[in-house]
Amino acid sequence: MPTPTKGPRLGGGPAHEKLILANLATALFEHRSITTTEAKAKRLRPHAEKLISFAKKGDLASRRQVMKTIRDKSVVHFLFTEIGPAMAERNGGYTRIVKIGPRKGDNAPMAVIQLVMEPVSAKQGVVREAERAAAVSAPAADEVVVGDEAPAAESTDAAQVEAGGVEQPDTLPDADAPATADEGVEVDAAEVDPSDEKKDQA
């Protein structure tokens, strides 16, 4: 017994499903964007991306594989000459599905499936590198958290001082220390002054 495909079953049987997907892919490559139900769009996406991968290869065997699915030679030509080279820099993700409102008649969920024809920018590579760097620096962020815990300990000491649990000295040693050092330097300079020594001798 053959294994059924993943996702919803389209049409009456397997042959009908293949025809539906082939027609949807043909319309997608011809118009670059089509509106269909969400279920059909989700089933079409891997099928269309596989055909685009064949178009990126561009050899005769790939063209024959695509011709098995898409019977319109003009669409195959457009796929191999326009769409395939435009997707050369992109590694997957050739299509995009955008959900739109439900259909008026039967309230079926609708979606627009379209080809992603925008060129791959250098910014996308930079964003990927930044994400990798952020993942690598995640352990470094843990070290920063340890540094943040120290001010919290200092704040608890300040709270104890305010509560009267710890005695606080009357003078600040940092404020007095530079003044004492300056006075000591002046005193040493006065003691070494040779004019004072001559006056003392006379």
From Swiss-Prot:
Region ranges (Disordered): 148-202
Transmembrane residue ranges: none
Domain of life, per lineage: Bacteria
InterPro entries cross-referenced by the UniProt entry: Ribosomal_bL17, Ribosomal_bL17_sf
Ribosomal protein among keywords: yes
GO terms (BP aspect): translation
Cellular-component GO terms for this entry: cytosolic large ribosomal subunit
One Pfam family per UniProt: Ribosomal_L17
Keyword list, A-Z: Ribonucleoprotein, Ribosomal protein
Acidic residues bias (residue ranges): 183-194
Keyword Kinase: no
Family listed: Belongs to the bacterial ribosomal protein bL17 family.
Name recorded for this polypeptide: Large ribosomal subunit protein bL17
Gene source species: Kineococcus radiotolerans (strain ATCC BAA-149 / DSM 14245 / SRS30216)
Lineage: Bacteria, Bacillati, Actinomycetota, Actinomycetes, Kineosporiales
